[in-house]
Each structure stands twice: as structure tokens, then as C-alpha cells.
Amino acid sequence: MKIALLEPIGVSKEVIDELSAPITEKGHEFVYYDTKTTDPAELAKRSEGCDIVMIANNPYPTEVVEKADALKMLSVAFTGIDHIGTDKCKEKNIMICNAAGYSNQTVAELIIGMAIDALRHVVKADGLVRNGGTSAGLGGKEICGRTVGIIGLGQIGLMAAKLFQAFGAKVIAYNRSESEEAKALGIEYKSLEEVLSTSDIVSLNLPLNAETRGFLSADKIALMNENTIFINCARGPIVDNLSLIHI
């Protein structure tokens, strides 16, 4: 069996060798590419004769899947799979394995970190001090007492909600279904319009798919207060980013 990792994944060659040793010891061929490419022709070349291809967030479009005649499984070291030609994979009976949930806590904590930075001007103050200035005039605010709106109350959204509550925030949420666990935590479900218009901090946590692409359109973005902190730790195309820039 031929297995190929088509892109670097942020670890050393020594780690790759250690992790791939059990594969090669069983007689399988393992190939590692330490450069990233989005060129379909190069991706197709790297995939030639492969039974299993591994990627992270590198695009693997339909035209590449089409040419991968030996491919049986596509292993994705990433949560989302919107960068893959999934329809063609289904058509060719190619199994897709992704790493759903591998970084839920990490992303939830990142959301909190971004909120703290936006409220307390951490990065800006750091830059000023490093250049001989002071943080004078950068009055900060607290999460405590703020209303936080979570759009998409899945695993990441719920984890972030719990963390915000630990800071003393009131959490409201918009989700297409309601969770008894969330209700037990005191999270209030609201309409999307109410979440956007009444929240001091809005955290977007939806997956990217055909239904959510462009979900946060210009008219919805306009519902937010000019002082609202908007955090998108989901995927960029869920938001009309041009409208976000200009509003």
C-alpha cells in the first residue's frame, strides 16, 4: 500500500519518520512532501499510485480526486472538509476521514483570548511599550457584565459559552436546535437578529457548508452595534467580509 502525506504539518522530519515507522515496518510505502502546493497538476502527480493520501488544510479539489485512480481513502488532519472535492470522492467511493473535534477546547480558549485582547488592547499596548511608550489612554473593559452572543452552539460554541460565563458574562445564543445542556447552564436562546443587535461580543462558530456560505450577510452585519466585538473563529466565507469591512 502506498501512503503519502502531501504537505508539511508543522512538525520536524524526525517526528514524521518516527510516526511513519510502524507503517513502513509493515511493508507499506510512505512518502512525505515537505513543501505545500495548490497546483492541481502537482497534487495529482504526488497522488499517483497512492492508496491513501493525507492532507491538512491543503486544497484537494475535484479535478485532483478525478485523477487519483488508486485512491481509497483521503485522511484530513483538519476539522472542516470544505477544501476537498467531496462529491467526486463519494462518486468514486473514496473514504474521507477528518479530525473532527481535535481542537475544540483550543478554539474555545482562542475565542476568549481574542475577546480579552479586544477589550484590554493587549497587542496594541505591547507594541507601544516595546517602542518606549506606555499604555496610557488605552482604557480597558471587562468581560464580566457583558452580553456575549454565540452563533452556532455546537461543541466549540458551548465550550466558549462556559468560559465566558466563568468570567461573569451573560450568554445568549442562536442555533437551529436547542440543547437541554445549554438551557441548564442558563444560556438563553434568541433569534439571530436579537443576538446580533444586543450582544457586546458576538462569536461565530458555524461550520462552512452550502447553507452557511454567506450566512452573515450585509443586512445582518448591520444589526450589530458599532462597538460590538465580532470574533470569527469559524470559516471566512460564512461572512460577507467586504460588507464587514465597510460597515
Where are these regions (language model features)?
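N-terminal Rossmann-fold NAD(P) dinucleotide-binding loop
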Residues: 157-158
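Structural motif corresponding to alpha-helix initiation and N-cap regions
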Residues: 13, 17, 37-43, 58-62, ...
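N-terminal glycine-/charge-rich "phosphate-binding" loop or analogous flexible N-terminal tail
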Residues: 1-50, 172
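Phosphate-binding beta-alpha-beta segment of Rossmann-like dinucleotide-binding domains, i.e.
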Residues: 92-94, 99-147, 162, 166, ...
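Glycine-rich Rossmann-fold phosphate-binding loop(s) that bind the pyrophosphate
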Residues: 153-154
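Structural detector of well-ordered beta-strand residues that form the stable sheet scaffold
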Residues: 4, 73-75, 95-97, 172, ...
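Rossmann-like adenosine-cofactor binding region
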Residues: 62-65, 177-245
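Phosphate/diphosphate ligand-binding glycine-rich loop within oxidoreductases
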Residues: 49-126, 246
